[in-house]
């Protein structure tokens, strides 16, 4: 009873997005990689020296993102098979995270929905769900996580590159790239429709890394003029743009005032392809011409 009371007070007094996860991360990243584990054994090993739920959620997430590679060679949601092969697609990542969380006594659900990853997806009608991610509960509050996108990048070959942006992602950010099939998982006061979602540009994690608060969401299909306006607590030193096929990016002129930053671009001549918008060297939006 005493432990439960301490745990409750501990959880309510912290912001999970600002918590120091170094202990949990160290456990996850230093467990021997060559050894084969069952879901039960691995979960116990990872969580046995952690007292708080917030750290248990994290240690499982970091182990999965550090040890499971994205590969179409294993499309199953069989979690034991994912563990043995160490490869999966989104279904396997989400299923494994859910199974391990539940083994540790943590609340976790898998969310099915639609993800936009390429500029060709802009404006394309959604017919069949193509992505899976998770929702977890900390101190009675729901948080969104995507182990697949956090693990790295895939462009014909998986490149391991952990991205913190997809752990406890704010709903206002995740909805720009992830549309849940069940709207209750949007966790927004105003729900986003399918018609609105498909018009969004492709959104990269630079949006979250730069802590950008958008004045409005630009359309994903480029017209002759593009405007982006946002505020942020970060210092913005540069903005760039690059068309598909360009070898180098083009510096963009922007202005700033007490309300934030603004950039206005004109495209008098456009051919088919894509355009990527960068802020502080990080990709933020992908547009379709």
Where are these regions (language model features)?
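Alpha-helical and coiled-coil interaction segments, frequently adjacent to or embedded
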Residues: 127, 155-289
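Hydrophobic/aromatic-rich core segments of domains that either
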Residues: 95-174
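Secondary-structure boundary elements
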Residues: 13-89, 95-104
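Short charge-dense sequence patches
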Residues: 10-16, 44-54, 127, 176, ...
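Bacterial Sec-dependent N-terminal signal peptides
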Residues: 1-13
């Amino acid at each position: 009873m005493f432990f439960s009371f301490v745990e409750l007070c501990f959880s309510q007094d912290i912001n999970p997005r600002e918590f120091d996860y170094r202990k949990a991360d160290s456990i996850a990243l230093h467990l021997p990689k060559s050894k084969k584990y069952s879901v039960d054994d691995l979960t116990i090993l990872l969580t046995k020296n952690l007292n708080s739920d917030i750290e248990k959620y994290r240690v499982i997430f970091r182990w999965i993102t550090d040890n499971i590679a994205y590969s179409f060679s294993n499309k199953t949601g069989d979690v034991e098979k994912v563990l043995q092969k160490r490869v999966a697609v989104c279904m396997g990542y989400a299923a494994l995270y859910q199974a391990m969380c539940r083994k540790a006594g943590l609340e976790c659900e898998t969310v099915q929905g639609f993800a936009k990853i390429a500029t060709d997806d802009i404006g394309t009608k959604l017919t069949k769900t193509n992505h899976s991610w998770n929702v977890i509960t900390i101190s009675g509050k729901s948080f969104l996580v995507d182990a697949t996108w956090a693990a790295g990048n895939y462009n014909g070959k998986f490149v391991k590159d952990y991205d913190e942006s997809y752990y406890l992602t704010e709903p206002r950010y995740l909805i720009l790239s992830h549309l849940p099939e069940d709207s209750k998982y949007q966790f927004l006061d105003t729900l986003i429709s399918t018609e609105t979602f498909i018009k969004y540009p492709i959104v990269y994690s630079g949006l979250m890394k730069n802590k950008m608060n958008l004045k409005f969401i630009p359309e994903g299909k480029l017209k002759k003029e593009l405007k982006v306006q946002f505020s942020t607590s970060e210092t913005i030193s540069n903005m760039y743009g690059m068309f598909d096929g360009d070898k180098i990016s083009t510096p963009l002129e922007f202005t700033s005032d007490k309300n934030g930053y603004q950039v206005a671009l004109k495209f008098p001549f456009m051919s088919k392809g894509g355009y990527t918008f960068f802020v502080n060297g990080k990709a933020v939006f992908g547009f379709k011409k």
